[in-house]
Amino acid sequence: MKSQAGLLLLIAVPAMASASALAAPREDLLAGYAAQAKQDDPGFAGFSAARGEAFHRRSFGRGKVDTPACTSCHADDPRAAGKTPAGKIIDPVALSASPSRYADPAKVRKWFGRNCKEVLGRACTAQEKGDWLSFMLSQ
């Protein structure tokens, strides 16, 4: 009995450490976006997954013609796979469907940089990034 408990502990501790290691970069990203959002707007009161969801589904029409909204490539349901205009399959953007997503801050910055310009025709604000990321982390 003790050996089974010990074995479970040996398995559970690294798994929890791994999950915590993946969460840290996401928390750091949100903290950085929050600091920037507060600098941009002293009235900033925090991120909202509801605003992030509205942002994800909104059609902007100011970027590329074939990508007027996040949902142009990423599915309306963030837990489902998406598809680029060229037909390439994109992994789901919801954390629950892609657990390792958003663990690499450089990739997150790269994709926000590219996708915001293509959809909005400009860089996303820190609040937009934090709201959208909060929505994806809640899914």
Predicted regions mapped to residue ranges:
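Bacterial N-terminal signal peptides that target proteins for export
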Residues: 1-8
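Short cysteine/histidine-rich zinc-coordinating motifs and their immediately flanking basic loops
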Residues: 82-89
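Electrostatic cytochrome c docking/interface patches
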Residues: 25-63
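N-terminal signal peptide c-region/cleavage motif recognized by signal peptidases
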Residues: 12, 18-20
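Solvent-exposed, acidic/flexible segments
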Residues: 41-49, 63-67, 101, 105, ...
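The canonical Cys-X-X-Cys-His
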Residues: 67-77, 132
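C-terminal capping alpha-helices of c-type cytochrome domains
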Residues: 109-139
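Short microdomains enriched in Cys/His and/or Lys/Arg
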Residues: 91-106
